[in-house]
Amino acid sequence: MKLFTSKMLERLMSEQKKKSEGLLPEIVKRLIQSKCSDLSYLRVPDGDDIWAPGYDGIVVNETKTTYVAQGKSVWEFGTNSDSLEKINGDYKKRTTHPLGVEKSDTTFYLVVPKVWAYRISTTEWEAEHREEWKAVHVYDASVLCDWLNSEPAVCAWIMQSYLENELIKIDTVDREIGRA
C-alpha cells in the first residue's frame, strides 16, 4: 500500500514553490538518516541553508542500503520545471569541476521531485553518464515515493507538516484509522 504517491509529491512541491528548494533536501536528508544506521558523515543543508556553495549534499555511508551506496556520495537537487535540463547541467558542472572529490570513488545522485517523463529512461541516462563516476543515480518522484513509503516516520512527518488536508485511511489488523 502506498501512503505517499508521486502526484502528492509533485503537488506538494508546486504548492510549496518558495519552500521546495529547501524542502526537497530536507526530505532526502530525513530519508537518509532514517534508512542509514551507519553514517560517518552527513551534510545536506536544507531550508534557509541551501545557498551554501558546493554540492547540495555529501554523505559517507559505511553500509550499503537500498537507496544510499556504501562509501562517499555527492548529491544535487533540482526543483526546476525542466528536470532533464537541470540534471544535465548539474552533471556537466560537477563532472568538469568536482570540487576536490575523487569521482572514481564517489557515487553521484541527482534528485528531482517530478516523475521522469523523457524519451530516455533514467536507467539509460545513468548508463550513458557513469563512466567518470563510481556510479550515477537519478532519483525522480517515483523513486522518492518508493523510498518514502519504506520509511513511515518520514512519510508521516511530511503528511503532518505539509499535507494535513490529505485524506489518509489506514487499515490495520486491529482497527481502522482514518483522518479527513
Language model features by range: what are they?
Residues M1-R179:
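Mixed-charge (Asp/Glu-Lys/Arg
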